Structure formats: C-alpha cells, structure tokens
Amino acid sequence: MGENEDEKQTQAGQLFENFVQASTCKGTLQAFNILTRQLDLDPLDHRNFYSKLKSKVTTWKAKALWYKLDKRGSHKEYKRGRSCMNTKCLIIGGGPCGLRTAIELAYLGAKVVVVEKRDTFSRNNVLHLWPFTIHDLRGLGAKKFYGKFCAGSIDHISIRQLQLILFKVALILGVEIHVNVEFVKVLEPPEDQENQKIGWRAEFLPVDHSLSEFEFDVIIGADGRRNTLEGFRRKEFRGKLAIAITANFINRNSTAEAKVEEISGVAFIFNQKFFQDLKKETGIDLENIVYYKDCTHYFVMTAKRQSLLDKGVIINDYTDTETLLRAENVNQDNLLSYAREAADFATNYQLPSLDFAMNHYGQPDVAMFDFTSMYASENAALVRERQSHLLLVALVGDSLLEPFWPMGTGCARGFLAAFDTAWMVKSWDQGTSPLELLAERESLYRLLPQTTPENINKNFEQYTLDPATRYPNLNSNNIKPNQVKHLYITKELHQYPLERLGSVRRSVGLSRRESDVRPSKLLTWCQQQTEGYQHVNVTDLTTSWRSGLALCAIIHRFRPDLINFDSLNEDHAVENNQLAFDVAEREFGIAPVITGKEMASAQEPDKLSMVMYLSKFYELFRGTPLRPVDSWRKNYEENADLGLAKSSIPHHYLNLTFPRKRTPRVDSRTEENDMNKRRRKGFNNLHEPSAFSSQSLGSNQEGIKEGGNQNKVKSMASQLLAKFEESSRNPSILRQEHRVSGIGKPILRSSSDPPVNSRCPKPEEPTPSPSPPLKRQFPSVVVTGHVLRELKQVSAGGECPARPWRARAKSDLQLGGPENLASLPPTCPGALALSGVLRRLQQVEEKVLQKRAQNLANREFHKKNIKEKAAHLASMFGHGDFPQNKLLSKSLSHTHPPSSPSCLPSPDSAATSSPSTVDSVSPARKLTVGKVSSGIGAAAEVLVNLYLNDHRPKTQATSPDLESVRKTFPLNVGGSDTCYFCKKRVYVMERLSAEGRFFHRECFRCSVCATTLHLATYAFDVDEGKFFCKPHFIHCKTNSQQRKRRAELKQQKEEEGMWKEQEAARRDPPSESSCAAAAIATPEGSPPDEPTSPKKPKSIPEPEPGDVAGGAASPLPSEWTAVRISPGEDVVGQDVLAVRVLVTSDDSSSDAELDRGDSEASSVEPFDERPQQPELQLPPLLKPFTRHSSLREALPRAVSPHDLGEPEAEPALQRANSFQCPTPSEYQSGRRFQSNFMPVNSKMTVSPPKQACPPPPSPSPPSSSSIGDLNALDSPSLPQVTVSNTASQISRGHCSPSTPIFLRRAKAHGPPKDLPLRLPRGQVLERTEYCLVRPGGNGLQSSRPPSPTEMASDGCQEAVAPPRDIRSIHRGPHPVEGKDRCLPDHPLSPWAGEEPGEGSTRPRRVEDGGLELAEEKSGLKKLVLTPEQKTWLLDWNDSNLENLYLETGARLSQKSTRNGSGGHVLKPVHPLLLPLAEKETLPAQRQSQEKMGAPAERAPGERSMAPPKSPLRLIANAIRRSLEPLLPNSDSGRKAWAKPESKTLPTSPPHAYTCSFSFRKSSSSKDSDQPSPKRDVASKASAFFSLGSPTARTAQPSAPSPPAPALCTHSLPSRSSKVFPALVPPPCGKMEDVPTLLEKVSLQETVPDASRVPKKRTSLFSSFRLKDKSFESSLQESGPRKDSQDLFSSPKGKVQPMGNAQPPEKQGQPISSTCLGQRVHPVSPEKDASPTHVPIRAQGTGTVSSTSSSTTSSADEEFHPQPSSRSKERKALRRRRKLEKATKQLVKQEELKRLHKAQAIQRQLEEVEEQQRAFEIQGVRLEKALRGEAADSGTQDEAQLLQEWLKLVLEKNKLMRYESELLIM
C-alpha cells in the first residue's frame, strides 16, 4: 500500500509539473485535464477544488507554490473564500486583466467562469511592469511558472507569458475557463418568472454551448479596447498623430543574441543623437523605439508620417488617420523592410538573423497601428434590473481604460481596476445598495487614470483588495449616489422622463477633461462653432460678441430650431443679445450673467463675464453636435420617439437644469417654422412697396434711402416679433398668433392684393388652413372693439407675428376713424397689433438712445444709428402719435384689467400681473373706446384683457425684444454688476440671475420669511419686484392685491357698469372682467402654489380645462375664454345659456377635438343674434371650449349631438358664471400662484351664488387670502371648483357673487319653468344641487328662503330657485345623471351652503366627483394637514396632477340626479357651512350645526390636499378586494341597485333630502388621451379623497332634525362595466345621451335612521379628519377607537339583505349609523384599488350599501350580513381596527421616509452652498486681481490668473448642476 501511495504522489507531482511547465494555452488545458482526471478532482467544485488539489500534490515545488497562494488567500478581505459564496460571475476575455480579476473573485469564493474566444496565447507584445505589478505576480507564484520572470533588472514580460502564468493560477483556484467560446450578448430574464425563475444569462457562439444555461449575477467585460458591454459610453483622448509599428523577431536564444542590450521606453529623451544618426543613415525617422528581449525580440517604434511616405510604406497621404493606415494604403513588403532596417540599426547590427516571428494568423508578426486616440469608458460599472433580477456589469482592462503602451500602464492600471472591481463584487455580495456601490466604484475609477508608479502606495506588502491599501489619498465618497442614478438601469426607466434624462446625463464631475479648458481653447471652440455665419467674426472673448450674433450663431449651430438666424440684424445688438440670453436660459438652463443692453452698450463686454458664460456653452455642446430635435421637454408630452433624441445628447446635463425650464412645447415647431418662413418672406420680398411707402410710412418719399429705411424698420419689427415669438414659444400663444390675429397663409396671400381691405379677408372668405380655427372668426363688431381698444393697449405684438402685417399696420390705422374701423374685417386686429409693435419699437429705441447717450465710450457709434432708427420710426408713425404713445406706455404699465383666468398663456402674464390702476385705465380706454364702445363684444373684451395683461409694454431695461414674454427688466433694477437686493457690487463669480435681476447668492431670500431661495424653487411677484418662497407667495400675493385693489374696485365697477350698458343691448353680459373672474388657474403641472414665473413653466403635458375656470392664469393656460351670459330679459327656459366662449386652444388639446371644434366654430354668429332661444343652444364655439373643460370626459363626447352640446354648455355656464364677478383686476391677485385652481375649471359647476352680494374686497380677509392659498392646495380635492362667487373669491380673494344665469332669470321671473331639455347634464343640477325637492309642491320650498342679503351675510351661496323639472335636465328618463341634492330645511350637507370662499367650491363640482366627491371634498376640507405635508404637496408636481386628475375625474363623473316625485326644486334654507378650524378635534366637529354654519369659522390655512399615495392604501385595497368574494348577497344587491331608481322622492316632509353620489373612473375612455402618469395621479388623488371624506357627510343635517325619510342615491363607479353589467344599462334610457353613465353605477340606498345622522356625522367627520391626519402623522386624538368604530362599523347599524331592498317609500327610516360608518371604512381600502373608484362612503341606506365595484357593499354585507349577530360585528370591528392600526404605521413610515429624504437633500444642499461660497470668495479674489482692483494685482501673471479663474468657474458650474439635480429630486 505504501508503495502505491508513493507512486500516486510521484505521479501527481509529475502531472502537476507538466501543467506548470506547459507553454501554450492548449497544452496547459490538456495538462490540467489529465491532472484532474488522474487525481479524481472535479474542477466544477470551485469551493473545494484548490484544497483538494493541494492535499494531493505535495511535492516540494508544489508546496512552494501553495505557500505563496495561501499567503495571498489569507487576506482578511477574502474571509477564507467565504466573502462571495453566493455570487456567480461571468468574465468575458482571457487576457491578463480578465484572468487577474477571475483570480481575485475565486479567492473571494465566487463561482467564476471565463470565456475566451481564442485557444492560443499568441500576443508577443512585451509589457513594461510597474514595481507593484511585479510584486503582485511574484505573490501568485509567477516565478514558479516562469523561471525567467523579472530576473535581475528585467521589468517586462510578454503578454503571452503573463497570460500563461495567470491562466494556470486561475485554473488552480477553481476558475472555470472555456476557450473557443465567443460571447455574443447578455440575455435578460424572461418575463414569465412564475413558471421558470430564470435570471440573467448570455448568448454564446457556439449556440449550443453548455454555458448558455449558466445564470450569473455579475458580468465583467475584459475583452479589449474595441469591445465594451452595452450601456457604457466611451470617451476619446486624442493627441498628435502617432503611428506605431510593432515587430517580433524569432529569438533563438543564442549567445550573440543574449549580448544585445535592450532599449528602454525612454530612449528618445536621453539619446537624441541615436535618432539623428538613424535618419541620416537609413532615412528612417522615428520618434521613439523600444526593444525588449523575451520569447521574441520585440521592437516597438513610433514612426513619423513623412518618413513612412518617403520609404513607400504608406502609399498615399491622407489627412484621416484611419484612411491613411488602412491595409490597402500600406505596402506590406516595405513595412517589413522598414521594421527590419530600424531593428538592425537599433541593435547595432548585432542580431545575427532577423527572421520575423509568426502571429496567430501565420503571417509575419509586424503591425502598424494608430494610437493617436485612446479610449476610456465614461463609467466603470452599472447595474441592470429586470424582473426583480439584478445584474452588476463592470469593465476592466483596455475596455475600461486604454493604456499608453510605452508606460506599461495597461497591465498596471488593468490590475488596479481588477482589484477595484473585485472589491465592488465583494460589497455587492454583502448587500450594499446599488447606488452606493456604483458611487464608490466611480470614485475609485476617477483615481485610476491618474495613477503612476510614484503616486500609489509604495508598501506593496500591504496591498489587499481594499482600495485604501493602494491609493494614498483615497476619497471613496467622491461621487455621491445621486450622481450615479443613471447607472442603475431598470426596464421601467422610460416611464419616468426625469430619470430617463438623468440616465443619459453624465454624472457631475466624472469627466476628467473639464480641467483642461483654457480661455484659448474656449476661443478656438467658439471660432469653430461660429465659422461661416454672416457678420460673425470671433477674434476674442469680448468685442466680437457685442452684436449678439455670435451668441445666436452658437445656439443656432446646435439647435437651429430655436433661433431664426437669417432674421437677425447686426445693428440690433440689444435684441440679439437678449434673444440669445433668453433662449439659452429657457432651453439650456444657462442663466445670463449680464443683460443684452449692457452687452451692446459696453465698448468691450466684460471678459470675465463672457468667459464664464461661454464656458457653459462649451461644457454643454463640446461633444458631438446635438441633433436639432425639439427640446427634451416633449418627453413630458409622451412623445415617445423623442426618447431617442434624448439619449443622443448624453452629456448635456444642463438640459434639466431647473424643473421650471420644462415647458410643454407640443407641436409648436411646425407653427414656428411657418412663422419663420413668413417672416423671411416678408423680409426678403417686401411685397407691398407702394402701399407700404405711402400708407405705412405716412410720407411720400419714394427714394432709395426711404426704401432702405423701410427695410430697416421692417426688419426691426420683424426681429422684435421674431424674438417675441421665439422666446414665448408657448403653444397657446402660437395658436393665438395664428388664430386670434387671423394670421396665416391666407393673410400672406392677401398681402399682395391691392385693396386695403383685401388684406383683412372677411370671415366668409375661404381660408386655406385645413380647419379654420374658430378663433379667427369673431363677429366683426367684436373685432372692431378689439381693434379699437387694442390700438393703445397692445404691446410687443405677441399676437401678430407675420411680417407683412407690419406694412399694413399703419395703413389699416389710416383707414380713419371708428367708422372705418368698425367696418374692418376680423383679421385686422393683427394689423393693429403690429402697429402697436412698431410704436413699441419706437419707444424702445428712444430709451435705448437715452441710455446709450450716457455711455461716453459708445456715444459716437451708437448715437448715430439710434438717431437714424428713431427718426425713421418717428416719420413712420407721424408725430401725432407720440403723445398717445407716451400716455399709452404710462397707462399700460399700470393698467391691466384682469384677463380671463386662463387668458393667454404667455408665461409672462401668468407670472406677472401688475396692479391695475384704474385711473390710468380710464384714459387709455377713453382714448380707444370712442364712438364704437357700444360695439365691443365679448371677444374684444377678452382680447383687450389679453393685451393689457400679457402684452403690456415691459418696463425697459432689457432689450425691446424682451417682450419675449420672458421677463421684464425694470429700469430701476441696475446693471448686472449691482445686486438687486443689497445694491452692492456683485462680482461675476458670485452672480446669480433670475427674472432679469442679478444678485448675490446670500441676498436671494424670501421677502417674507428670509429663507434662502434657490433658482429652481422661488416665486416672483412682478408687481412688487419681490421674490418669495413658494409657500409664502400665495398669501402675500392675495393680500397685497386686495390692498392695492380695494381703492380701484369702485371705479372698476363703474367702468363695468358702463360697459354693461353699452353691451346690454347686445345681451352680452357684464365685462370681461368676468372673464378673469374665473379664479386663478394654474398650469397643471406646477406645484400648487408655485408662482408661474416666466422661467418656470412646468412641463405639463396638457393644460386642462381646469385652467380656465380654475383660477390663476396659468403660464401655459391652454385656452383663454370669455363667456358672456346676458343678464337676461328672457324667461328661464329661453336662451338659458346664450353664451359665447372665445377659445384659443393650444396644441395640447386633442387635435381631433380641435378640428371638430373648429368646424363647429365656423357657424358662430355675432353675439347679438338669437335673443331668445327656446333651447339652450350652445354655440359650437363651446366645443373647443369644452374640449378643454371637459377634455378628459370619460367617454367620447361625440356620442351624440346632445353630448356635444352638453359638455360645451357646462363649461361655458360655469365659466360664464364665474365670469360674472365685477371686479376685473382681482384675478390678478391669483394670477401668479400655480395653485391648483385649475381643477376648478373643468366643470365649474356654477352653483347658485348669492344673487346680490356686492363684491366686497373680501368678506373675510383671512379666509379669502388663505382660501386662495388653500385652494391651491386642495383644489384637487375640490373638483367642485370654486366658481361663481367662490371662484371669484377664492381666486381673487374677495367674493363677487354671481348667480347662474338660469337661476337669476328664474328669480326674476318668478316660479321657474321647465328647463330646456338640452341643459347640460349636471350643470343645472350642479347649480340646483343644494335645492330641495319637495315631492308634491310646486313653487319654492315653503320654508322661508333667505333673502339675498341674508345669504350674503351668511357668506353662503345658495341656490336660487331653480327650474322645476330637473328631470328634464337629465335628458333622459334616468335622473341618474342629475345632480340635485335635496336638502332639508336645516342646512344639511356641508356643501349645502358653505362659506363662499370655500363651501361653494365644493358643491360646484359635485358633479365632478359626485356628491361623494363633493362631500368628500368638504370632508377633506376638514383634513388637517401638517405644514410639512402641505409643502410636500406643494413641491411635487404630483399634487398638481392629482388635483387635476381628481378634478377631471370628478368632472367626468356627472352627478346622477335623483329627483323626487314632484321633481320640484325647493330653495334650500340655511345651507350649512362646515367650519374649517385648522386643528379642530373631534369635539369641535361635533358642534352644533349652527357652529358649522358660521361662515367665518373656516380656518384660513386649511385646505385639504391630496396626500401622496401611500402603501396603506394599497394594503387596504387588497384587503377590501379579498373580502369581496365572501359577500353573500352581492349579486342580488347589485341587481337591486342597478334597477332604475324611482324618479320621484317619496312624499315626505320638506326636509327629506336626496343625495346622489357618483364617482367616476378617473381613467375613463377619454382619459386614455391623457398621459398615463396623470392617470396614476388621478387615482391617487381620488383614492385619497375617498379615503378621507366621511360618507355621511353627504346629506346630514348639521343640527339634529326630526327623522325624515331620505333617499340616498349613491352612484359609484364600477371598476369596469363588466363587473356590473346590470348596473349600467337599466338606468339610462339612452346610452349616448349619458356617456358618463357607462362609467358610472348608480346605486340607491335608503337611510333608515335619520335621527342618528347628526351625531354620526360629526364623529365621522372627526374620524375622517383624524384619519387623514393620520396620513400626516397618526391619530393624535383621544378617540381613535371610537372613530374607528364609527368609521368601520356601527354595531347597531342594521343592514338589510340586499335582496330585500325596500321600495323607496318604505325607506323613509332614519339613516342608520351603520351605513354611514360602514361606508367609510371601505373607502380607504378601496380607493387605492384603482383610479376608477374613488369613492365609497356609505350613504348607507338600511337596505343597501352601495359599493363601487361591489367592494364596499359587499364588504358591508360581509361585516353585517345579519344585523342581529353582534359577534360578527365585533369580529368585523376588530378586523377594521387592526387594519386601521396597520395603515397608521405604514403612514408613519412613509412620512419618516419622506422626512429623511428631505433632510438628506437639505444637508446636501447646505454642503453645496458652502462649497459654492468658498468658490465665490476665491473667484472674487481672482476677479479683483484680474481687474486690477487688488493690491498686488500688478505682480501676478494675468494668463495664470485667468486660467485659475476659469477653473473655478468650471467647478462652480458643476456645483450648480449638482444643486439643480438635488432640487429636481
């Protein structure tokens, strides 16, 4: 036996020796296989293979190797092979770096597989080894495998030998190596993970290789410089041309060969004579040569191009290196002789024979290649996630960082990268989060290119995997996790545009080239980019940029779509510069550091400012030029194709600089192009020479000079206009330009027509545009008014783009007095607007002249030009105009009556609304109105408003073109070097700019709370020139505007009266002030109260209807509308809605609808027609309007003509109603907040407001101001929109009552008559919802209705006797659609009569969310939100979306009406108001109804908001769903509910009330048009509402009332019609008539226990409030248990089996507390379930519990199937309590997470601020030195200072990007 053992050991030792000595790849594998077979080892058992091999091979040689390998493996990082036992790694490439990585991973215990596509190691190239590399290889036993390894002074090794050493070590350590296997690509885990849980795999060639089934967690690319794994971008480092030749000659190892000296890689430096002699003797000119002796004689030489050409190696000379060195251009024989000759000379002809070694292709091993450019990957690693499987992807070796061959960096840095990668895998296995992992890896990777043998640790013994042992000055937190988010790639990325963009943005500071920017380099780059542009000659960084053309050229070069360069005029420096500044700021986030005016006026623009500014363009664009795709913003409109465009600009991280830069552009580009074409046409072919010179200029000089002047003026006007258009790229403006002004191709054509009038084609003339925009076709009278007014008020001509109009403008004016004007066709307003532009130009030039005159340095040059311009303009306008102009500019700067809420999108208007001063208004109006004031129509009013508000002349401090709607730079602002706040000097480095103001960072504070502001998060009040933090903006704005305007109200009212009189004859309602009355609508996307500052239009895909009625004019209001409801002489039934809606829609609305609207619009007739309309006929105009207001209706509107009419009417009515407010300027107050008033709009159900309340500035200032504020927050929760009074109140801060027209008329005419059948569904009811229905009565309700005065005093809005037969309103037998809620004498429901400021808002939109929503809303109002939550909601666009959506969803759900038997509407008595006390607790809520009714009690600060969707909802949902199947009678119940409800109420005392609730699916059919993200938000919002609002709120008398029969109808959305097939059809007679029914389910419930209601209700409220509060924190009040009881069950409640639902007559029992309570519970869970059903709250009727999608009711049944069984109730109660507890905890956790995130971001912001401060201090010091202001400035080198300063600038730019990323988070 002993002999056998010895033999085995001897044999093992021999086999192992064979393995160690193997000299080829194949030989090594063969020896290894024999060894493992003989020793009975399993190489696949990687964990035990090495230990078993070690135990079986015990020879002394082997032991020496084991010792070395064990020593290496004893490092603590490896944990004896247990660090990465769960990790499987695939390494692509068997080169030195791939194998070195495999060895490290094997030491860590990972399963490692290496694939190598070759089976030979034939690379003879010799590597220079750094000392640490030699030490490392020795530690792996290199000397044991290759005895000559680094013998003596040798510090190099051939790649082949190195590969063999590492190959053998890897095999010994259990690495699985496959040769002749080629990696193709990574395969993602399949989607079907349930059946087969397959992770990441790879595709290989051959396809059937066993590795195809191998799943791995880590993949490492080590396959050379030409290959990188997908997802890594590469950067190129270019040097001067370098052509290398490598040659390998056979080494026969003779004595002669051994004597030859090697030549090191630094020969060139020390031996110049050698190269000179070589050239002289052989003609070979080399830059360098290296000779290493190894297995071959290895030569590497760097040859000069000319030498290669001279020797015939390169056949033809080409500038392109690739072409130069391609095989066809190289003579191979000459190359071989060239290499041999050089080698001979280099070795002094001592090598006896120079025979070429053969490469792996069997050819002489000589190669010539270009290493002019080297590549490096931008990132070292990334993480992919698919189907919950994570994959770590990394690069090592040349794939990661290509080396510079003479320095030996390839192997050295390759090994360092291998260690770093193994360290990362170790962290990965230990569960480090992906972002932290990537951040650390990137931090290390930044160090890698900087490593040299000198700057790494010299103590090689200490080297381990831990990077700290290798890099002396390691900062592994250099890169922050948030900077590497783009390296964490998930499938869902494309759904999140922000993340998507982040992913294509280079991480801040990862570029290692930023430090090499020098002023000279910057100049060169600028010269390259501006080459070929006319009039652009960049010779320096100062004077060359004065004209502004160079800046425009750079922008045009990369984004030609942004600037029409051809239209720019070299003489208009101010305009050009400002245009460039504005475009750069808006599109790229590059804030200006100087104004356009300063640029032009300075003899030499400030060099430092220019260097700083241009460096930002350089950083942004220095990569490959951007494709001229439309800006990334389109991504937000879900234009998927642009995703590609985005990824094509990977490094331009400025793209996202501030969220506010993202404005939806929709399809503006085509329009823009059209306009540019038009502009060019007008410019190049001045079509109307005679007309222009005679009429336009008002002088008959026909000379050439005059022609030149014409050109000049036209070009000036056109540029001004162009800039205006370009910078106000707002889509709706474009639409207005095209449609309102009637500008379009037709007009261009007509420009050549001789007659003056032909230029303004009449409406009936066919227009070429496919669908004549209805906006173009205003009745002529209207236009006349518009024209007249506009003459004085237009500024900047935002509405009149086409150039030919400039020519016509004057001629049109010269048509004469009002008589002619009155006869002008509708399109003339464009011309007149242009005249305004020209005048404005003149003013601008005058001011510029004055300013420039002060500048001595420029006086000589500029004065002359300006005089010319001024003189020319003067001659053009005639001196007669001057006084008016002056007056105009004065009055306009103060004047601007309100514009309709969503009036004009110009961000400027939205952002800026100056206080209107009435006195100035009057003169202007007097000047303009003149004789035709009586001819002014609604459209004119709107337009006037638009012009007053949105195009009023900007105070001049910037260029005239600054009318670019971007910002106004007031004259008093000071220069760019003066701080706007502290008035001290602000140096370039410390200069920030916003709204055209320049200031210090530390001075940029909220003027209320002095909080430091950031450029991405501030609000600006243009009127006062103050900056605010977003939360304070609304309050300040509202209050200040109230103060300012109180004095004006009277005069404005008088004016309005005057206008009303003028228009009374035409039946046009009061003034357009009412237009504006629509409360402030904001851009849906913007955070609720974020100011819509011009810079911050949010990129919201589509402004929604909400905008209009909503409230603040949004910066992007999609439409502006004027609705006039004539006060009416006609009876209720007649012309109820004689409304005209003037709409300018923007592209964001669906085109289909637009077209439909347009075609309908053509039929619109002048307003005075149809004095009496028996039916409510909505002018087709309304269609587009509805398009917005009910754009999101769930079902297509086109279902039937009726449908078309209806929706149109509704919004119109709403708007009309809201527009009734007399005080025009009030809206302005809200103009700025991006409150979510928008929701208000969509279906502003105009609730009957108090008829006669005068508009007091604010009934209760606190409530008004806060209400506005609150509204902003919770409009989402109020889809009921604040309309009529509320609308005005809330938005404007004071309530100006207005009654729905039909109500008003009804009042006027006594008992109402039947309403026309076509009244919009929901509209009337919405207004009448608060009305009581007395089953048998005919007139008004018997109980005494409060008089208007009383109402006013109550602050409650009440329904004025509405028309009787409400059923007719529902156009169909099914009252289901209606919305009336009948209330008992005592105010019943919260919304019944809420304080004007708030309550009204609820009812209005009842239709929207249905009562439920409404009620919820009211309930929500009671929600007490913590400040953090408020801010949270404010800050995230989500909340807006939620509002929006909520609102839309609500809007969608048309309330179903249940009318009592008589169907007569009774007037409610004292509608109740819910107090909104901010911290009201349970007891407070239980207060008597009287208290609830107190209008003033509503706490100003309180507004409910939609909290973010939290997991608790989801859980609740799931629970709820799980209960559904268990419910016994759900089917029968459903059927019961489904059956049509009785149309009459059971006869009962007047206080019987009906409640109808309907919650519509937010994501209904029409929603599909909307972007899905919004839908989600909608669901969130709706879910939240449902959760938060007590159901019982709905119709409970606030004071105990005697039990009364009540019919509660509950319309709940069904999750899908499939679920309740029975529910849908029966109630609706005609499906088409009630599209919403398709999405709604109407359920009837009776309420048995009315007596309990009041009590229940208060507890419900409190519980809800508590519940919501718990959303914020958790129930803090003492009664949670009790509440939860109320909420989730009421033991006493008796629910009758559904099947037994009693007929309505029998249902007159008191409401059972059960129902109320029950309903509530379901709400929470269900609401989360899906966007569709928001609702549920139970209006429980004893018989049935209504459920949306059966969940609620079924749940109720489940919990109380047998009212008698208390035990079941208890169980249910316990369950609910448990659920409630769990939800509370979840909510808390959610809150904590948000808090932590906020704190982390805050900390990072503070750090950034500190760093910026440090940079600023240093920058100011340098700037002073550069400007000669420092004491020692003369002694310092300016170039060096400038270089240093520029470096600081770049660093600061990085910080600012980082800061903006943080703010975006």
Curated annotation (Swiss-Prot):
GO terms for biological process: actin filament depolymerization; cytoskeleton organization; heart development; heart looping; positive regulation of transcription by RNA polymerase II; sulfur oxidation. One of its GO terms (molecular function) is F-actin monooxygenase activity. Interacts with PLXNA4. Interacts with RAB1B. Interacts with MAPK1/ERK2. Interacts with RAB35, RAB8A, RAB10, RAB13 and RAB15 (in their GTP-bound forms); binding to RAB35 is of low affinity compared to other Rab proteins; at least in case of RAB8A may bind 2 molecules of RAB8A simultaneously through a high and a low affinity binding site, respectively. May interact with MAPK1/ERK2. The keyword NADP applies. Residues 1589-1598, 1740-1754 have a biased composition (Low complexity). Residues 1251-1262 have a biased composition (Pro residues). Belongs to the Mical family. Disulfide bonds: none annotated. Residues 1299-1338 are annotated as: Interaction with MAPK1. Keywords: Actin-binding, Cytoplasm, FAD, Flavoprotein, LIM domain, Metal-binding, Monooxygenase, NADP, Nucleus, Oxidoreductase, Phosphoprotein, Zinc. FAD binds at residues 97, 116-118, 123-125, 183, 298, 398. Zn(2+) 1 binds at residues 979, 982, 1000, 1003. It is found in: Nucleus; Cytoplasm. This is [F-actin]-monooxygenase MICAL2. Its EC number is 1.14.13.225. The keyword Flavoprotein applies. Residues 664-676, 1048-1070, 1364-1384, 1532-1542, 1564-1578 have a biased composition (Basic and acidic residues). Residues 2-494 are annotated as: Monooxygenase domain. Pfam families: bMERB_dom, CH, FAD_binding_3, LIM, Rossman_Mical. A motif (Nuclear localization signal) lies at residues 660-681. Residues 660-710, 726-777, 888-922, 1040-1115, 1144-1298, 1334-1409, 1478-1612, 1669-1782 are annotated as: Disordered. InterPro entries: bMERB_dom, CH_dom, CH_dom_sf, F-actin_Monoox_Mical, FAD-bd, FAD/NAD-bd_sf, Znf_LIM. The lineage of its organism: Eukaryota, Metazoa, Chordata, Craniata, Vertebrata. The modification Phosphoserine is found at residue 631. GO terms for cellular component: cytoplasm; nucleus.
